């Protein structure tokens, strides 16, 4: 968090996770733009976005790119922090890209999207980039199977999340851009070490996804 008093304000509300928008003594989670608009007193913007089918296709593309990049990560760097001000290893970051996908699959099976669900750390058997990529392959296959079998192609069903009941389509979109943002970070790490990412993901590839402007936001 960039604001020096930001965490203190969150703790005052009993909140430990971002994004959060606060106004006076009220706050809402920032995942739902309509809730934010209501809090600040403006009209919510109309949102169309990608269709669920486009989101799944974009997600698989992003996850396959992540497989390439984690294989390029130097093993000796995996326990280093991705950024100095956050206690998260590069190994964790690479695993997290795919764990987001597994979390969404669990939600489609009736589980709640809690804060903790996509943040499960890698197990003791995940040590190398190849280990992460193999885990990623399992997730990619399962996402493809789920999408091929689901009858709810509009993703209209509402699912429980830590920020309330939400349409599955919106939770899917959040998971897709969340993975995509971390893939951008993996590319940035490779470039930091002067390793050219294998077939870089471009801004054009991510068009239509609400990824943050900054790579480390």
Where are these predicted regions, by residue range?
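Thiol-based oxidoreductase modules, predominantly thioredoxin-like and allied folds used
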Residues: 1-6, 16
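Structural micro-motif
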Residues: 11-22, 31
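Non-catalytic, surface beta->alpha helical segment in thiol-disulfide oxidoreductase systems
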Residues: 22-48
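Short, charged, low-complexity loops and linkers
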Residues: 42-55, 124, 131
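Alpha-helical bundle segments that constitute or directly flank the non-heme di-iron/ferroxidase center
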Residues: 50-74, 95-106
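Acidic/histidine-rich alpha-helical segments that form the ligand environment
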Residues: 59-70, 124-159, 166-185
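Short, contiguous alpha-helical
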Residues: 77-122, 160-217
